[in-house]
Curated annotation (Swiss-Prot):
InterPro entries: Pyridox_Oxase (IPR000659), Pyridox_Oxase_N (IPR011576), Pyridoxamine_oxidase_dimer_C (IPR019576), Split_barrel_FMN-bd (IPR012349). Its EC number is 1.4.3.5. Pfam families: PNP_phzG_C, PNPOx_N. It is an enzyme of class 1 (oxidoreductase). Binds 1 FMN per subunit. Belongs to the pyridoxamine 5'-phosphate oxidase family. Coiled coil: none annotated. Catalyzes the oxidation of either pyridoxine 5'-phosphate (PNP) or pyridoxamine 5'-phosphate (PMP) into pyridoxal 5'-phosphate (PLP). The gene is pdxH. This is Pyridoxine/pyridoxamine 5'-phosphate oxidase.
Length: 206
């Protein structure tokens, strides 16, 4: 099945970017071999140099797109410093892409706690043991830290580390791209002046 045979109707007619994203993600979940929620996250350091890495989208609604991380990691420090970020989803099986960018806010403690409890126990231990993005002397040092926290939290619930939580990108721009023949692709961008503004829809040259 081609990308053009998916999503009923012409996606360029949609006026609701979050609803359209939900439709595309659902189709990616049925089509992608793994991790349809994987997304490239771009941040900028204090010198204006960009960094990009893959993360997993863990939620979205009309307020924005949520992912979780160690706030002491490179991406955490850069987001806390610049308070803005960008994402790019690419679903090769569908020949589609979604780009978005905007200011970033921290999710509530209740929201972060609720998600943290859904993680595998080993992943929760790892959130304590890993000094993410810091130099690591050896693999043994990491495994030792994991063993120490495993012993510390052998009984009962594992609390969420104070340095581990979620970010929500509140997009001011969302672009939907669909592959077409001869590189005459469809590009529709939704723009708004602020995270609470009204959307303007613009068709872009490929």
């Amino acid at each position: 099945m081609s990308a053009n045979e998916l999503t009923s109707g012409d996606f360029t007619e949609s006026g609701e970017p979050f609803k359209l994203f939900a439709e595309w993600l659902k189709e990616a979940e049925a089509s992608e071999p793994n991790d349809p929620n994987a997304v490239a996250l771009a941040t900028v350091d204090e010198h204006g140099l960009p960094n990009v890495r893959m993360v997993l989208l863990k939620g979205f609604d009309d307020d924005g797109f949520v992912f979780y991380t160690n706030f002491e990691s490179q991406k955490g420090r850069e987001i806390l410093g610049q308070k803005k970020a960008a994402m790019c989803f690419h679903w090769k099986s569908l020949r589609r892409q979604v780009r978005l960018r905007g200011p970033v806010e921290i999710v509530s403690d209740a929201e972060a706690d609720a998600y943290f409890k859904t993680r595998a126990r080993g992943s929760r231990i790892g959130a304590w043991a890993s000094k993410q993005s810091r130099p690591l002397e050896s693999r043994f040092a990491l495994e030792k830290a994991v063993a120490e926290y495993t012993a510390r939290y052998a009984i009962g619930e594992i609390p969420r580390p104070p340095h581990w939580s979620g970010f929500r990108i509140r997009p001011t721009s969302i672009e939907f791209w669909k592959d077409q023949q001869f590189r005459l692709h469809d590009r529709i961008e939704f723009r708004r002046p602020s995270p609470v503004g009204a959307w303007e829809k613009v068709r872009m040259y490929p």
